[in-house]
């Protein structure tokens, strides 16, 4: 459940919203027009969560905050709580509605968008970069992260032909794998933060997933079959409708 509030007087113009359901809640607050600060809290059970949410809401109303039914949840950026990390309640509503499989909030599966070290780092740096530069072209981010920030080599997502991927793996296996993972993490990361994805980055992300599927086959990971996790991500990203 989401509730949103506004406080306005001669000196202040602030917003505060809360999303609480199950055993966790998230709040976002700050000056109207700003991204604001995000905080997430988890509880042992739903009863404790509801009790804390009611307490927080009552405290805000006592201070003079008024509920704002017209608050726009869509045209906003969403960032994870730095102390808690990856969480569905600090994800854009479009991400929450479309990417419902638990794999998208998985912090340990190497194939999931943010479960690998590479994916987690990509999301963290992407969020920090978008805070500083909200108009950042996310399609440029994978190469910028790997080459400019990390001083390593980025392999472009141009080809999904098996012979091309095989040749790139022979020349530089680590860079090929890392580039795939960073690219599709960035694609899902843009949606998680902004609720939409550029047409260019969506194509790059789909190519990265296809290339990673081929990489698993070429390097004989697992049982030699296509990864159902990667295929699920391909299907879900393909079907995601919000592009710009």
Swiss-Prot record:
Designated name of the protein: Uncharacterized protein YfeS
UniProt xrefs under SMART domains: WGR
Ranges for domain WGR: 1-78
Matching SUPFAM superfamilies: WGR domain-like (SSF142921)
InterPro entries membership: LolB, UCP026317_WGR, WGR_dom_sf, WGR_domain, YehF/YfeS-like_WGR
PROSITE patterns: WGR
């Amino acid at each position: 459940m989401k509730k949103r509030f506004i406080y306005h007087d001669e000196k202040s113009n602030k917003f505060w919203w809360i999303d609480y359901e199950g055993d966790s809640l998230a709040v976002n607050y700050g000056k109207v027009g700003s991204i604001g600060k995000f905080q997430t809290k988890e509880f042992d059970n739903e009863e404790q969560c509801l009790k804390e949410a009611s307490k927080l809401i009552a405290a805000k109303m006592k201070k003079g905050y008024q509920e704002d039914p017209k608050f726009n949840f869509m045209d906003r950026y969403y960032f994870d709580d730095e102390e808690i990390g990856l969480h569905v309640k600090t994800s854009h509503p479009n991400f929450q509605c479309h990417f419902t499989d638990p794999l998208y909030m998985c912090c340990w599966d190497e194939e999931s968008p943010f479960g690998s070290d590479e994916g987690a780092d990509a999301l963290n740096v992407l969020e920090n970069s978008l805070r500083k530069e909200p108009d950042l072209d996310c399609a440029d981010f994978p190469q910028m992260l790997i080459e400019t920030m990390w001083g390593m080599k980025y392999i472009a997502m141009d080809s999904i032909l098996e012979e091309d991927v095989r040749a790139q793996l022979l020349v530089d296996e680590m860079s090929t794998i890392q580039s795939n993972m960073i690219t599709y993490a960035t694609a899902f990361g843009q949606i998680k933060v902004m609720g939409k994805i550029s047409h260019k980055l969506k194509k790059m992300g789909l190519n990265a997933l296809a290339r990673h599927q081929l990489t698993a086959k070429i390097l004989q990971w697992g049982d030699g079959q296509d990864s159902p996790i990667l295929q699920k991500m391909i299907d879900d990203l393909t079907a995601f409708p919000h592009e710009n």
